Amino acid sequence: MVESAPANRRGFYSSWSLATQGLATTFGGVVALGLSAWLPFATGSETVMAEWGWRVPFFIGVLLAPIGCWLRLSLENDVPEPVRNKKAATSESAFSLLLQHKATIVNGVLLAIGSTVATYISLFYYGTWAAKYLAMPQHYSHAAMLLAGVITFVGALLVGMLCDSVGRKKLILISRVMVLICSWPSFWLLVNYPSPGMLLTVVFVMVSFTTLGGVPVMLLISELLPKRIRALGFALVYSIGVAIFGGFAQYFATQSIVLLDSLTAPAWYLGGGTLLSMLALLYVKEPAKELQ
């Protein structure tokens, strides 16, 4: 999407990646909220979701998988221009190319860590945490996820357009500063004033700030990498930053509660990831209008 977009529309084009994730989260929230309301009524059991109802969304996901495969196979690939110097191209391995851009890869990983930690905590963990530790009804957790999905979908498209007018780094910096400022107060407010309204308010605020930085981060990383290694480099950045620090975010957050014996402990993980991302901004330049 980034390579096929006009130079002044790359932000909006790339924003659809995060926007569709928000749409998927919204759909997941609707399904979870609907099942948590309908299954107990239909079966007469209040524990049906814990017993087997939680498997239903996974079954729906399996049914949707072929559609995703079909959509991916139907997309046109950007065929690179013929390589003029085959000998020079083949002698230079992908590994050596990555080494030449190792600073960009490291900065990309740090940027991705801040973005993905904030995304996983704000979109998915607040609701789960509130249900587990604050004894809030599970359907409020699903409602929080639904709200997060809607904000991500709408917000990503708006931020994408904003990227094209004000740049990437400024939005990332504002996002990171606000997430850092709000990370501990968000958990503290929920611990001291636990209510569904407070949960939804916290999710609304944190997801909004997270989305503000999520779109420009992924765009910036792809723009910093040269075309020859853009796919490989982005995959490496994504696998380390997202799969490890994002995929295990809820586990790390939960373990921090055990280690520090504090319900606000996940704020340290959220704040730490955010600080790493801000550190990378010091060494990253605003990309040129034309891609390499």
Model-derived features: where do they sit?
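Glycine-rich segments within core transmembrane alpha-helices of 12-TM secondary carriers
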Residues: G11-S36, V237-A249
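A membrane-interface helix-boundary motif in multi-pass transporters
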Residues: A37-F59, A253-G272
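Multi-pass alpha-helical transporter architecture, strongest
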Residues: G68-L75, G271-Q292
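Extracytoplasmic gate region of multi-pass secondary transporters
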Residues: K102-T152, F245-Q250
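Helix-to-loop junctions at the C-terminal end of transmembrane segments
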Residues: A156-R168
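Cytoplasmic membrane-interface "Motif A"-like loop-to-helix N-cap segments
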Residues: S165-V177
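C-terminal ends and interior cores of transmembrane alpha-helices
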Residues: M178-Y193
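A late C-terminal transmembrane helix in Major Facilitator Superfamily
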Residues: K227-L259
